[in-house]
Amino acid sequence: MNARVVHLLRHGPPQRQGLLLGHTDEPACVSDCPEMRDRVRHLALEHVVTSDLARAARQGEHIAHDLGLPLRLDPQWRELDFGAWDGLAPQSIDPAALSRFWDNPEDHPPPGGERWSDLRARVCEAIGRLETRTLVITHAGAMRAALSVLTGLDHRGVWALDLPYRALLSLRLWPGSPLSGQVIGLVTDSAP
């Protein structure tokens, strides 16, 4: 069995920026779609999968249509669930609680939210279903969880890569169990 190549594309900026958007269904700025389509046009894709949240799904619809490929929505590619913090500006959250979360999202998840291990587990399951030459339009947290699953990096290690809006992360998935892989490309927008 050969290695599979998959590409993870972070959705474009949401309409309201600067908020913790986990499962909050905030639409993206649709104007970003042409740039995102241009970014993936050369990838020889066969499949397009997207998170079911609007900020990813709407852009996935445009990309799949432009490429003439079917689209599959998969809620396992959603962002981390921020629970009671979902949709809030970080400044409105208790600084000590937010700091504990960023330092250790496993032991200090948001109130009513998802642990890091839960995000990793659902993304791991989603990765296992991917076919080669697949584009997944998703969220930064899910992309970081995929990196953690495939490379063994912990939650601190995956933050070493900047994954801004519209970042395209290309991965080679090795056959076998457990899942493993390597980063083979990262494309982001030029610095402003």
Predicted regions, residues:
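Short, active-site-adjacent cap segments at secondary-structure transitions
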Residues: Q15, A56-A57, E79, A142-A145
